[in-house]
């Protein structure tokens, strides 16, 4: 989708707040009559023909920088005050009401601000209106000031307007954002919401549950037990979680539904700060090694890594790649990721157009000296030649081969070959690490033919292998693993699952050389990211997926041993990953993946192979294999049309402490967990002495998992 840079409006007003000038700022040559700015001009200010100015206010400016810019824009040499009818800019009141310099106020209540425009005006990417008044025309002239314009800002803006017609702003945005808010709903608000769901009869599955120390009181038509004392969960018609709240916080995935449900509730909302990551795909590649040729600290701060930028307030980080940009922000600002992408694309057009690689003798020598170097017995550094030998076979447009030598020709026409005096390192290949990171084809000399390598295919045959090839470098556990990466397991599971297995790594780094089989972590297959935020989410996922899931030091199983599949999943930063066995030969970069040895964990399942009755009453029988009514297994979904109450038995802390970890390795379907809770109550009813708790449980569940681990 093509990103449209929104117009901006600057209004200069006189003593009576009458509009003296209305400047419509846009990088385009016309007025967008569908824009909110034009609607505001026409409908609220009754201005049909503003001044069209081909300029643009950078949303990254501080208030003092903005003030200097506006003075230059309007050609005002006097002290000015800037303000807005939507947000507080330069000044604000202590109660955060909107500041207006023409309204009488107690001056001691004014607070001065020099923050960044996009922070104080969160909607600025889509709708920016700034009012400017001469200080002498307002009721507080002493609060006005004059700021000199930063000439670098004007220089940058001029260059921006020059390159703007050339920019390809066709982008696609993926986001993983923080949608959790603090709220004042409490139990009363949650009851109103669940009542409204039922009154509207919208067929959304819902659950309002309230638990005491040992669990349960519940209503709703979707039963999932979690570890929060109070929880409201509502699911969309397609089964995805629309919203979840414990009364103090709320996670919102369906904004429209939530808005409809709380329309008659006085709801206070405050977004909980947390990182939001946007991945912006570019239709036209950029140069990821950005270099700024003028002062641009009013937009970005350059870092030691030339493909990473920081915003001026250091709260937004931008990672550049050839075909996409990753933007991480601390809090949600509407469309800020598109705006920063626009600035990055513009800067690339100004200073960093995609260039051909320079000669290796001028730039890449540093890489040769570090990685592809000559030693006493190894001659790995290629040499430059001026011509091809007669009779050499053309392999591709940039690679030739004969019985004696191989020649690679780079984008600048420089010819490289390998001529080892010892006759060993005569095969031309390429350094993987720099190709993986920056797509640089840096030649090096090898013992064996390299044509089977993925990097060779990319550099010589221009075959895009980015998504097909997995890097042999193994990351430390804890980071989200992308499609082309893999990581180690946590130490405890690495030792457990890889007992007796080995992986040979290259010396001094974590690059896999060879293994006949080793458990690692990969991203899950497919394009959909599965995110599990709460225990309820984990239970539902394990129940539906019917595979083992590792969360921290916990192992979650489906309820019945017969349901356990052959996959092992693991949760990293709330994202579901997959545990697999990796195999690799030393002679090849090809990495093969195989299913894990799931039986190692499955054997920990606290199973009971023979159905054993635990308690029975009035035709209801609780067994180790489920709950039966009149001899039939109870497997009906619970309905919101009924209310179920379980009166929990009050037990001593000692009893509760012993019961708590005993079901650590078993996570069940919702109704089964309901039964499990009832079973615990029954066992307490059975007056089990704390000293006999474990023997009593092992009577019904001989393979408790606890004994095996110990």
From Swiss-Prot:
Cellular component per GO, a single term: virion component
InterPro entries on file: Poxvirus_early-TF_lsu
GO biological process: positive regulation of DNA-templated transcription
Alphabetized Pfam families for the sequence: Pox_VERT_large (PF04441)
Subcellular location: Virion
Domain of life: Viruses
GO molecular function: DNA binding
Keyword terms, alphabetized: Activator, DNA-binding, Late protein, Transcription, Transcription regulation, Virion
Statement: the UniProt record of this protein carries the keyword DNA-binding: yes
Assembly and binders: Heterodimer of a 70 kDa and a 82 kDa subunit. Part of the early transcription complex composed of ETF, RAP94/OPG109, and the DNA-directed RNA polymerase.
Function: Acts with RNA polymerase to initiate transcription from early gene promoters. Is recruited by the RPO-associated protein of 94 kDa RAP94/OPG109 to form the early transcription complex, which also contains the core RNA polymerase. ETF heterodimer binds to early gene promoters.
Family that this chain belongs to: Belongs to the poxviridae VETF large subunit family.
Entry protein name: Early transcription factor 82 kDa subunit
Organism: Vaccinia virus (strain Ankara)
